[in-house]
């Protein structure tokens, strides 16, 4: 049994609560993010041409939008300091959609973690405050340090897709005013992301924060780590 949701210490949006109990079966989550090098292997192995790897809607999206690589990837012999940058093979892959993350996980023989599995790894035996990476937030030139529980890049590198739909927690009640209008009406057809990116403000870099994208969206430093059942 694990606790999901915001603990009540400090500011949180209403979609992060209330805190509740979640039953988790034995699982393992990778202690690092998937890299550009690994994604290159996926591409070279025909990942974007193999329908069996993709969800049905994902395959329709790939074919309909001519998707052959993560957003912003291109092959070019020339670049400038102000323009295109060479991809570092060992840097986390970013700007991918949920469809792509799920297809890669299937190809690799794993799956995406649930948001509550991710939370459990991020919090470890510590409180949410202790799990918060003090270096996170706008760290465009450096990677986040490893967490005490062994997870590398949990906070501050990229938003990480989970397989959990963006839905209300038990006993959730939308807040009054604009905040409730925003979060409550978007709880349909989207997936939860965790971890915060290099462009995320410090206050949003915490274990309980729930970002959410539609499965085809890949614009804000989105990446993944792998999980499996034990």
Predicted features along the sequence, with ranges:
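Acyl/amide activation-and-transfer machinery of modular secondary-metabolite enzymes
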Residues: 20-23
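Acidic-aromatic/histidine active-site loop/patch
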Residues: 35
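Short proline/glycine-enriched turn/loop segments at secondary-structure junctions
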Residues: 181-184, 211-218
């Amino acid at each position: 049994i694990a606790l999901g949701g915001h603990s009540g210490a400090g500011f949180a949006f209403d979609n992060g609560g209330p805190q509740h109990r979640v039953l988790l079966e034995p699982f393992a989550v990778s202690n690092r993010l998937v890299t550009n090098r690994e994604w290159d292997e996926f591409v070279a192995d025909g990942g974007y041409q193999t329908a069996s790897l993709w969800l049905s809607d994902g395959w329709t999206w790939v074919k309909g939008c001519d998707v052959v690589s993560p957003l912003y990837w291109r092959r070019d012999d020339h670049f400038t300091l102000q323009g295109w940058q060479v991809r570092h093979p060992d840097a986390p892959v970013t700007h991918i959609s949920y469809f792509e993350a799920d297809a890669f996980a299937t190809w690799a023989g794993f799956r995406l973690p649930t948001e509550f599995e991710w939370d459990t790894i991020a919090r470890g035996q510590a409180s949410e405050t202790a799990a918060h990476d003090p270096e996170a937030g706008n760290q465009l030139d450096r990677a986040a340090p490893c967490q005490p529980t062994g997870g590398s890049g949990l906070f501050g590198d990229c938003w990480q897709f989970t397989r959990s739909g963006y839905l209300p927690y038990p006993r959730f009640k939308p807040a009054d005013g604009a905040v409730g209008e925003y979060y409550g009406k978007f709880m349909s057809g989207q997936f939860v992301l965790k971890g915060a990116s290099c462009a995320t403000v410090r206050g949003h870099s915490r274990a309980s924060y729930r970002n959410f994208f539609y499965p085809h969206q890949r614009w804000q430093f989105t990446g993944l780590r792998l999980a499996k059942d034990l």
